Amino acid sequence: MTTHNHITSVLNIFKGRTGKRLMLFLFLIPALAIAQETKKIIILQTSDVHSRIEPMTQEGDRNYGQGGFVRRATFLQQFRKENPDVLLFDCGDISQGTPYYNMFKGEVEVNLMNEMGYDAMTIGNHEFDFGLDNMARLFKLAKFPVVCANYDLDATVLKDLVKPYVILERFGLKVGVFGLGAKPEGLIQANKCEGVIYQDPIAVSNEIAEQLKEEGCDVIVCLSHLGIQMDEKLVANTRNIDVILGGHSHTFMEGPKNYLNIDGKNVPVMHTGKNGIYVGRLDLTLNKK
């Protein structure tokens, strides 16, 4: 059993350019129990990559020449050599934004994510842009789980392809990971998400997090595509979630921000902007009885 005697969270943002910038932020969550064994894991996060296969190409843009899958893949390869206990997640909207997506409808993005060894992703609203059948095609190609707990997909072709959550048994720990998607109304054309039933993310999160806790998860991670404002509400009205990795609002945070959950406990929320320019890093230190 693992107790969160303390969780030390560090966010390193690596900018996609030669001579990467490193910004370090540290905070502690108060002790809950006496530890006998310490375990450290690193969580890496991307979100709202929007098909940015190549670096930014618009001259005059402050991010010109940054981002791109090659830079990210190179960084990940080197990072894993130096840090063996790493989990890699994406918070949705891998789709839409360049001709690669228009031509290949997401296949390039998913295959590259397979090569980079992603551990899980959740669904962004732009994943629906070519409809449910295309989503099913892509998720079958994925060598990583796709999780979304607040979309009822039983009446769609995604029924057996998307899970509410997964439990990853890594590094001697059980890591519970669940996803949350944005409300389709106003974001997704009705004919592109027919049969998808949106459910309240707060109610669903409390249910799933409690279930993951009962299943003995040492860490519970939420992959959210709700946007920063909804993530703030999510924290304030839930319990048992240890980390929220967010997307959708294209918010770049220079470090994780702590919010109090319904029990008054700190929960770090992390957003890493858009276009794959940044990779977020969160270091967790857990103490096991």
Predicted regions and their residues:
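Acidic, metal/ion-coordinating pockets
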Residues: 35-289
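Hydrophobic h-region of N-terminal signal peptides that target proteins for export
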Residues: 27-35
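Aromatic (phenylalanine/tyrosine) cluster motif
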Residues: 14, 25-27
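N-terminal secretory signal peptides that target proteins for export/translocation
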Residues: 1-19
